[in-house]
Structure formats: C-alpha cells, structure tokens
Amino acid sequence: VELAYYSDLAVRLVNSEEPARGTDSLTSVEAVRALFGESQSAARRATDADVTRLRSVRARLRAVFEAAASGDEVLAVDLLNALLIEFPVSPQISGHEFRDEDGRPKWHMHIADYAANAGAGYAATASMGLAFHLTELGADRLGICEAPPCRNAYLDTSTNRSRRYCSDRCATRANVAAYRARKRLDAERSASPPRRPSSDRPDRGARTGRTADTAHDSIPATDR
C-alpha cells in the first residue's frame, strides 16, 4: 500500500482549514479537485456538493489528530474506525501504471473505492491511509503543531519520534519565540533588586534598639 500517499490525503484535507487563523481554502470544487493531487480521474468526478461533504469529513479527521496528540489513543482509534465503517474500501493489486527498468509491472497494493461521489472516495482513501499509518507506526505519530497559533496536523516520520511542528517554518518561529521569552525573563531578573539573605537581616530586637536581656530587665519583678 502506498502508505505515505494515502495518509497524506488526510493531512492535506485537515490542513485546508486553520481554525485559529480563521482561514479555509476548501471553498470551491476547484479546491476539492486540488486535494486529489495526482489522482485526476477521481478529481474529475468532484462537484460543488463535495465541498460540504469533505468539510464534514475534515472535522472528523481533525478530531482523530487532536485525540492522538493529546495522548488519547483509544478515542483516536474509535473516531477513525467510525470513518472506516462509513467509508469502506477494497484493497486490490495494482501496478500497470508503474514499470521497472525491464518494463515489468511493479505490483503493489492499491486502495480502490467504489464510492458514489468524489467526496466519499476521498474520505475512504484518506481514512484507510491514516489507519495504516497509525497501526504501523503508532498513534503517537499523529500530531498537531505546537507553534501557536498554528494547529496544523502532521505525521511524525522521525526516527526518534521527536517531531513537534508541522513545518520548519513553525519550528523556527517557536524557537525564536522561546529565545525571546528567555531573554525577557533574564532582563526582568537583572532589573529586580537582589533580596538580602535572611542571615543578614536584623532581628526584631535590633530593629527596636532593645535586646532580649534589656527587655527582660525592664519587666517589673512582680510580673516575673
């Protein structure tokens, strides 16, 4: 199965909207067709109705990423299973369009869908691709960008599971913001007067000019 291609369909759809910034690029049938990328035969089936269909699927796929990113693997799996049930696929062996250097077919598993419309077909392949990614690499490989205000989804393919941002641009922006925050904190600490150690502070008797002994001596004998 072309894991990277199919799972990327889910990321592409989720990131067509940036809720924190109030932007949404999925507004026309042309935008729907652009999501399909190389699958032009499927893209040609798209209609205006698929805009609404895919927006609904997009919200559900984002919920999968959000659940996985928060550590709730069970919820992520349940949400994804619901999509797989609603949008089934049929795996097939394919390879006629790919040839090796000797001209022989490069056989591979292909996710075929028989959906009634382009939106359902996209949902089927995107959901199955994400399911393969989750089961093969782990739910913790599904992430949400940690560089506010960005909330883009991403698939972590790093060797040490260390990815935290959707892009190099967001990673750089987050690092710069963290650096500036540290510099501000250092400046605030430098501007504050140092606190005197408790050992250097005069005791109450010293502040009043009286020692414990003189205070004792001033008490009338009848009160002692």
Report the location of each language-model feature.
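Short helix-coil boundary/hinge micro-motifs
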Residues: 1-144, 148-155, 188-224
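Short, glycine/charged-enriched secondary-structure capping and boundary segments
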Residues: 159-161, 181
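Cysteine-rich micro-motifs
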Residues: 161-171
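Short metal-binding segments enriched for Cys and/or His
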Residues: 174-184
